Amino acid sequence: MSGSRRITVAVGVLMFVDASLYLAVLPLLPHYVHRFDLSTLGAGVVIAAYPVSVPVVSIGCIALVPRLGARRITLASAALMTVATVIFAWAPSALVLVLARFVQGLASGSIWTASMAWVTENAPLGHRGRESGIVTGMLSAGSVMGPAIGALAGWAGQGIAFGLVAVVALLGVLLSYRAPAGRDAVASGRVWDGLVASARQPATGAALAIAVVDLLAFGAVDLLVPLRLGSLGHSVAQIGIALAIGAVLGAAVGPLAGRLVDRLGAPVVGSSAAACTVVIPLVLALEPSAAVQFGVLVAGGPLFAIVGAAMFPLSSAGADAAGVSHVTATGLMGAVWAGGFTIVPLLVGTLAQAASTQAAYVVILLLCLPAFILLRRRVRIIPRLAAADAGPGT
């Protein structure tokens, strides 16, 4: 196995753990409410403790990766996630549970930023899409396992279920240790200057626009569609099966989407995926049948895999064009992504409660449209990414 592929596999395993930990807690919320006497707000704190720190960590990694190296930060993050998962598994109180989940989120932020930069900095020339697709495919596989881990924890106990996740996280530590350091990220001067320089590039702007469309649409879908299906009498198991099918499809589509990105270009693939995503809130605002809403849940997995396969090569191409390290672009992406997935469910929930579900979808659609228009404008002026991808890594 080549050095670059060892990096990709190591990061993919950590992304698998990250996705499974984020989603595993959802089926367990009723258990935590009963065991720790939590209010609805307290249950919300358990969920929010994971992503709340990611934007700050992502920006911090931009300064730290050039100094310490992406591999070292990945190793430290993987070790931190392993320890936090063990503590989470046997948390004796709600406070320990929330703190352990907060630490898992700290590790998640640096994995998304430093580790993805490690992948794109060292991907073979012309194959960033392929390597990014492999990672997002493994992320989708983690999304499959998350609800299953939660179900196992409810049946066999948290110690066994999350202990198994900790073992996989430890495997990620070992794989990261054995992977080569690869190219070192070059310091880009002041963090803010690097962020601005990267954000001004058309490719980075396109990547950010794709991310915004995705997090707006699926931030709404993740909250409102399961609630709607539940109100129509469909079981948790049926909803979980639909999500699992989507995640399985995402795991299969990820590598294929990466190869498509390398062949057709990230702008073409990314803008096509974003166009499909923009349609989703429009369709859901029309109150379609349950079958259509189940279809949306299934479509989420492969659509996310395609988005990820295009988004990371776009952001790294923008970093190359700006003359900054890839971690600058991935840090910016991570901050936007995590911030969006923290804010959007709160916004959508407030709108749905104050007005209606249809009104919430209409607002999301209206927010998606400017991002999609910006994407189309950026795509028109992006130089052919194959040329950017073939350039020297920074």
Name each region found by the language model.
Residues 134-177:
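Helix-loop-helix hairpin linking two adjacent transmembrane segments in secondary transporters
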Residues 56-92, 261-264:
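Conserved MFS/SLC helix-loop-helix module at the cytosolic interface between two early adjacent transmembrane helices
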Residues 166-185, 372-379:
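C-terminal membrane-cytosol helix-exit motif in multi-pass small-molecule transporters
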Residues 111-123, 307-321:
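Intracellular juxtamembrane helix-capping segments at the cytosolic ends
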Residues 1-4, 179-207:
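Juxtamembrane intracellular "pre-TM" segments in multi-pass secondary transporters
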Residues 84, 95-103, 291-300:
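Paired small-residue
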Residues 37, 69, 90-95, 233, ...:
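Helix-breaking motifs and short loop linkers at transmembrane-helix boundaries and internal kinks
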Residues 100-139:
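Cytoplasmic helix-loop-helix junction between adjacent transmembrane helices
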